[in-house]
């Protein structure tokens, strides 16, 4: 039965385990009715037989038999109607119960469909949540990888800048040492020239003036 509150649940019935009663088709239902009310089909057969005999007597021209068969047909029809009314009154309680059970069966089927629909929605919701979690994990891993790559690139740039700074300092130190050595060599050479020997006069680099030609008048 349904999983609702106890107050909404129908009372148990002896038909609950009778699946054949709920799942019978039209032909099975007619057979069940014939078994429950056998006088009704008997009255129908008597009516058909009386009508057939009346037709045959009419073809033969036997008017007395025709009248007799028509009376028999009316009696058979009346018997059928009485059987139907009596059967309806006798099985009224059972039919009412069957109708209620049919309604309960319909409610049960509707509740089962509703519960199945809810379970399907819950399953879809769980699948969507699992998919969303996987997507979030992938995004997180991608972000972590991107962050690690960025940190490594920054560290590599810092190391390269440090190496360039050290190389610049080394070159600057070497250039300073070379200039200092050159300056020391020049000073020592000058001191050696002054204290080690006579100072030479600077050579006159001015070119000698060419003598002018004598005046022919002198």
From Swiss-Prot:
Keyword Transmembrane: yes
Domain of life: Eukaryota
Transmembrane segments: 38-57, 69-91
GO biological process, one term: mitochondrial respirasome assembly
Residues of the HIG1 domain: 11-102
Function: Cytochrome c oxidase subunit which plays a role in assembly of respiratory supercomplexes.
Residue ranges with Gly residues bias: 186-196
GO cellular component: mitochondrial membrane
InterPro entries in UniProt: Hypoxia_induced_domain, RCF1
Keyword Membrane: yes
Chain intervals with Basic and acidic residues compositional bias: 161-172
Name the UniProt record assigns to this protein: Respiratory supercomplex factor 1, mitochondrial
Region annotation (Disordered) ranges: 132-218
Cited PANTHER family: HIG1 DOMAIN FAMILY MEMBER 1A (PTHR12297:SF3), HYPOXIA-INDUCBILE GENE 1 HIG1 -RELATED (PTHR12297)
Taxonomic lineage from the root: Eukaryota, Fungi, Dikarya, Ascomycota, Pezizomycotina
Membrane topology qualifier: Multi-pass membrane protein
Compartments where found: Mitochondrion membrane
Keywords of this entry: Coiled coil, Membrane, Mitochondrion, Transmembrane, Transmembrane helix
């Amino acid at each position: 039965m349904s999983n609702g509150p106890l107050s909404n649940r129908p009372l148990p019935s002896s038909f609950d385990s009778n699946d054949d009663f709920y799942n019978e088709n039209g032909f099975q239902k007619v057979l069940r009715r014939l078994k429950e009310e056998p006088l009704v089909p008997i009255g129908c057969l008597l009516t058909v037989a009386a009508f057939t005999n009346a037709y045959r007597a009419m073809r033969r021209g036997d008017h007395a038999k025709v009248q007799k068969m028509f009376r028999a047909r009316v009696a058979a029809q009346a018997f059928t109607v009485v059987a139907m009314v009596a059967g309806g009154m006798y099985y009224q309680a059972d039919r009412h119960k069957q109708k209620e059970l049919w309604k309960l069966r319909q409610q049960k089927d509707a509740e089962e469909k509703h519960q199945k629909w809810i379970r399907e929605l819950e399953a879809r919701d769980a699948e969507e949540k699992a998919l969303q979690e996987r997507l979030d994990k992938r995004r997180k891993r991608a972000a972590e990888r991107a962050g690690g790559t960025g940190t490594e690139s920054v560290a590599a740039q810092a190391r390269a800048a440090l190496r360039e700074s050290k190389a610049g300092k080394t070159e600057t130190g070497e250039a300073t040492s070379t200039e200092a050595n050159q300056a020391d060599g020049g000073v020592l050479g000058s001191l050696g020239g002054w204290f080690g020997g006579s100072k030479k006069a600077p050579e006159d680099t001015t070119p000698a003036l060419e003598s002018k030609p004598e005046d022919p008048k002198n």
